[in-house]
Structures are given as structure tokens and as C-alpha cells.
């Protein structure tokens, strides 16, 4: 199972891909120029780790709370990938994980299953 995790809700854009049992991560500044090329950052990240969007089984995206622009852009990309590539996605918030402490990004797929996060449902949490 190959999982992609995207978090653009904070001051960094965080990407993680779990390929079998291997975990690869990177981060970028959360800036307007990076929002405009987020899909390029994702594609380059996957290529660097010898995979592609076609090999991703599930995508997990942080729905907030956090940056409106970051959440909006990451959700738009994930929704587009769902429509064009038929990749299921899960919109999580660290608030969903019921006081689980020290949550690592690689734990997100297991926690989404544990807390029954619904697939292909977008309910963003924006900070005012």
C-alpha cells in the first residue's frame, strides 16, 4: 500500500510518502509561490523517491485548522487527483485523533482507520 500525506495547513508544506514500509518526507516554505506549484512539488517529491502519482493508493490531507490558502490549495489538488486518477483520499485533522499525543505523519493512515475518518469527504477547518 502506497500512501501520500499532504499537510499545507501550517507554516510549512509537509509531504510524506509511505511505500511499503519505507517512509520518505520533505517540507517546503508555505508561500504563495509554492501554493501555485504545489502539484509540481508533489510530482517532483514522488519522482525523487522513485514512485509516481499512478502508484499511490490513498492520499491523506490535513484539513486544518490552519492556513486558508494552504488548506484550500491542498484540498483542490487532492480532489483533482481523485477525479482524474480515482485515488481515494482522507481529510484528517490532528484534532480528530482524540488526544493522541505525539502523532507522527506516518501514523496518520492507521489513526484514520482507528477513528473511522470517512474517505472522499471534505470538511475543512479554517482559522479566522
Regions found by a protein language model. Give the residues of each.
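Oxyanion-binding and handling regions
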Residues: 1-40, 88-128
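Short glycine-rich anion-binding loops that position phosphate/pyrophosphate groups of nucleotides
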Residues: 11, 64-65
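Short acidic/glycine-rich loop or secondary-structure boundary segments that cap or lie
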Residues: 14, 68-69
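Short, residue-level hotspots on alpha-helical faces of the histone-fold
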Residues: 40, 44, 79-80
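Phosphate/pyrophosphate-binding loops at sites that engage ATP/ADP/AMP, CoA/4′-phosphopantetheine
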Residues: 42-58
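Phosphate-handling active-site elements
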Residues: 50-54, 82-94
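DPxDG-like acidic metal-binding loop motif
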Residues: 58-63, 69-87
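Short, active-site-adjacent cap segments at secondary-structure transitions
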Residues: 67-68, 98
Amino acid at each position: 500500500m502506497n500512501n501520500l500525506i499532504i499537510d499545507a495547513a501550517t507554516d510549512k508544506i509537509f509531504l510524506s510518502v509511505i511505500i511499503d514500509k519505507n517512509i520518505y518526507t520533505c517540507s517546503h516554505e508555505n508561500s504563495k509561490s509554492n501554493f501555485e506549484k504545489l502539484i509540481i512539488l508533489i510530482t517532483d517529491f514522488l519522482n525523487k523517491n522513485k514512485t509516481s502519482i499512478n502508484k499511490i493508493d490513498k492520499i491523506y490531507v490535513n484539513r486544518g485548522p490552519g492556513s486558508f490558502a494552504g488548506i484550500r490549495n491542498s484540498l483542490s489538488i487532492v480532489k483533482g487527483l481523485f477525479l482524474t486518477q480515482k485515488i481515494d483520499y482522507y481529510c484528517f485533522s490532528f484534532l480528530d485523533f482524540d488526544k493522541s499525543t505525539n502523532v507522527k505523519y506516518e501514523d496518520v493512515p492507521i489513526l484514520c482507520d482507528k477513528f473511522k475518518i470517512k474517505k472522499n469527504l471534505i470538511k475543512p477547518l479554517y482559522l479566522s
